Amino acid sequence: MEMRFSDDFLKALEFSRDEAVRTGWHNISPDHIMLGILRLDDSFVFDVLGCAGVPADGMKAALDDAVFVEEEVPWDERDSVVMSDGARSFLDHACLEARRCGSAVVEPLHFVLAACRVSGPYCHDYLDEHGVTLRSLVEAAGMKWEDYRLDRPAAEESPAPDPQLMADAIERRLREGYSTGIIPVS
């Protein structure tokens, strides 16, 4: 089986590297991926966040403030900026959220669902501080809570992607630019 990342999600991953460089980081964190998602034009995520009571512009400003450091990353070192272990773990969680939603394609929304579920990064804290729950996001996305497969492990339906294979494929795409977005899973 293959897990596929949508073109929008791959574009957000490319933006996440730019966000890491812009904010002075030498690696890409889950918050940089969220900032990359918030840079997408006309993304469904904006509608979902708005319905859940979170203005995307406010979230972007708060994340910028939280992750910005006064260290500059030279633009010529951009290609050496890689995913952190935390970002890789969040990508794995986004894959699981896609499966829980019944999708073989990982969309930016699935990352936002993962951010709501998994604590650690500032994006999770921001959603939590604004009273956003997993259920409110699922329903804001137009899904029925009863249809969301929270009660079953996502791996029941298909195997979880190998995190190292997935991370290697994403790193390669970040270096080469996104194309098909197909990630092999074991």
Task: For each feature predicted by the language model, list its residue ranges.
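Histone-fold recognition with a strong bias for associated Lys/Arg-rich disordered tails
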Residues: 1-186
